[in-house]
């Protein structure tokens, strides 16, 4: 029987949102899961699993599938948004009228605002006001492994210390899911956006056939780009050596569960952008993130040569091999002070 209030309302019933809802419910919490497609929600309720992406993971009894947005939002004090970054602002506008006076917002979306490159915290503040507590979770997480209960660790940053502790307690499970609090709200957000871009580059490199040396060099210099941009925005450099930085970057650049990596591999193998996106069949966050990270880097005058070349491939039709040669042919640099 459903209680008066759930521990968490998850907005976004894709693979990752569903995996997080399953994890919370498996921890013994009542969780409400809402998605924008009523037919899809009805199918989730009928099957009691996500047949498309997580067919082997049954929903715990405490996971409640909800089709009505107002009911989903008011069911819990804490609202977890797990949607693609390009619709993040639109979703906040949708949920705003239904938020409770004591609502708190957390998101697992990795990216920046479409076109503007703004951090999602700025979108949330502009849309929902200054008083609502905000938080973000990020780190090396593939939905299938998380839903299956395989060991996973993430970073959590919040604007409010009490909210951070509450979320850590809700999410943390000693058997499989470890949650690290991190006070760097900017850095935890930024890492998840930049790693998507670098993962496309790693995929391109492997698709061309450049080998492990090249992939590792690209990951390492990609981390340098992430750190430079973070420093310009006031992030803590240590964050980028943690779960939301290096952890997520390595995972996304090296494992074929990553859509961004697979997308890049197809480009390196000769697919055009549209064909590669169609073949993936799900949102490739790094495609839009590349444009937005470039905008943000230009705003802060941060040199990001890998990001620039990936942008040239995705939006200007540059050949992937030519992009790689452009990177290799750059002038000599000092490792710690050059781009």
Swiss-Prot record:
It is found in: Cytoplasm. The active site is at 195 (proton acceptor). One of its GO terms (cellular component) is cytosol. Pfam families: NAD_Gly3P_dh_C (PF07479), NAD_Gly3P_dh_N (PF01210). Keywords: Cytoplasm, Lipid biosynthesis, Lipid metabolism, NAD, NADP, Nucleotide-binding, Oxidoreductase, Phospholipid biosynthesis, Phospholipid metabolism. One of its GO terms (molecular function) is glycerol-3-phosphate dehydrogenase [NAD(P)+] activity. NADPH binds at residues 15-16, 36, 110, 143, 259, 283, 285. Its EC number is 1.1.1.94. It is an enzyme of class 1 (oxidoreductase). One of its GO terms (biological process) is carbohydrate metabolic process. Pathway: Membrane lipid metabolism; glycerophospholipid metabolism. InterPro entries: 6-PGluconate_DH-like_C_sf, 6PGD_dom2, G3P_DH_NAD-dep, G3P_DH_NAD-dep_C, G3P_DH_NAD-dep_N, NAD(P)-bd_dom_sf. Sn-glycerol 3-phosphate binds at residues 110, 139, 141, 195, 248, 258-260. Its main location: cytoplasm. It catalyses: sn-glycerol 3-phosphate + NAD(+) = dihydroxyacetone phosphate + NADH + H(+); sn-glycerol 3-phosphate + NADP(+) = dihydroxyacetone phosphate + NADPH + H(+). Belongs to the NAD-dependent glycerol-3-phosphate dehydrogenase family. Catalyzes the reduction of the glycolytic intermediate dihydroxyacetone phosphate (DHAP) to sn-glycerol 3-phosphate (G3P), the key precursor for phospholipid synthesis. This is Glycerol-3-phosphate dehydrogenase [NAD(P)+].
């Amino acid at each position: 029987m459903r209680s008066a209030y759930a521990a968490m309302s998850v907005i976004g019933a894709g693979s990752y949102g569903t995996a997080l809802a399953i994890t919370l419910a498996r921890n013994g919490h009542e969780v409400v899961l809402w998605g924008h497609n009523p037919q899809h929600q009805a199918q989730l309720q009928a099957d009691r699993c996500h047949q498309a992406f997580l067919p082997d993971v049954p929903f715990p009894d405490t996971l409640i599938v909800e089709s009505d947005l107002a009911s989903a939002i008011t069911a819990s004090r804490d609202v977890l948004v797990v949607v693609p970054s390009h619709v993040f602002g639109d979703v906040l506008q949708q949920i705003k009228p239904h938020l409770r006076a004591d609502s708190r917002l957390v998101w697992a979306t990795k990216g920046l605002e479409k076109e503007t490159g703004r951090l999602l915290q700025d979108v949330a503040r502009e849309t929902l006001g200054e008083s609502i507590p905000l938080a973000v979770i990020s780190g090396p997480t593939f939905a299938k492994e998380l839903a299956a209960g395989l060991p996973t660790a993430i970073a959590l940053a919040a604007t409010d210390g009490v909210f951070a502790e509450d979320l850590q307690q809700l999410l943390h499970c000693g058997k499989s899911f470890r949650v690290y609090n991190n006070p760097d709200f900017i850095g935890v957000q930024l890492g998840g956006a930049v790693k998507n871009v670098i993962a496309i580059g790693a995929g391109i490199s492997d698709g061309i056939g450049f080998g492990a040396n090249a992939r590792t060099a690209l990951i390492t210099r990609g981390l340098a780009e992430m750190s430079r941009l973070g420093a310009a925005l006031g992030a803590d450099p240590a964050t980028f050596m943690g779960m939301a930085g290096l952890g997520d970057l390595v995972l996304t650049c090296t494992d074929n569960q990553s859509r961004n990596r697979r997308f890049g591999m197809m480009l390196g193998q000769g697919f055009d952008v549209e064909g590669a996106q169609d073949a993936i069949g799900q949102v490739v966050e790094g495609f839009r993130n590349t444009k937005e990270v470039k905008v943000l880097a230009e705003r802060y005058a941060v040199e990001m040569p890998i990001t620039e070349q990936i942008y040239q491939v995705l939006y200007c039709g540059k050949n992937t091999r030519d992009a790689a040669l452009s990177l290799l042919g750059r002038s000599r640099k000092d490792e710690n002070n050059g781009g």
